[in-house]
Amino acid sequence: WLAEQPWTVHERIALLGWSSGGISALWAVRPKTGNAAELNDFRSAVAIYPGCGRLNATAWSARVPTLILIGGADEVASAAVCQQMVNGARGRSARAVVHVYAGAHHDFDHPNRPLQLRSGYAFSVDGSGRIHSGTNPAARADALKRVPEWLKR
């Protein structure tokens, strides 16, 4: 839809997604197949605390520069799995970077969410459904600087 709008600057379309939206962004930047190869492409992508597990199992690679921001203490999405996914794509992928915020949990960029234990999550790294979630001021500040810099490239 966006690519068909007359006001769109086609060379500047980027993807940005958080959590499940970040997973969707990572799926969307995989190599194109079939008729999709003829469509306009994205300039870049940013995925913030995405779960990389299923993508890692697919021999993921990106066709556009992709930035992943994730907390080192995230219990919903494993930073180690995202790093493994990106490392596995080296040599067959566009530039992909994972930036891990040590000690940061899921929702680290929320403007004002005290760190708290939440339960009932469908996905958690340990399978318990319990995760910590909340703002990490240093990670938030860095992400607010890092994302626009990435998108300007």
Predicted regions located by residue number:
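A general structural signal for well-ordered alpha-helical segments in protein cores
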Residues: G22-A25, C82, L144
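Short alpha-helix in the alpha/beta-hydrolase fold that links the catalytic acid
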Residues: S78-A89, R113
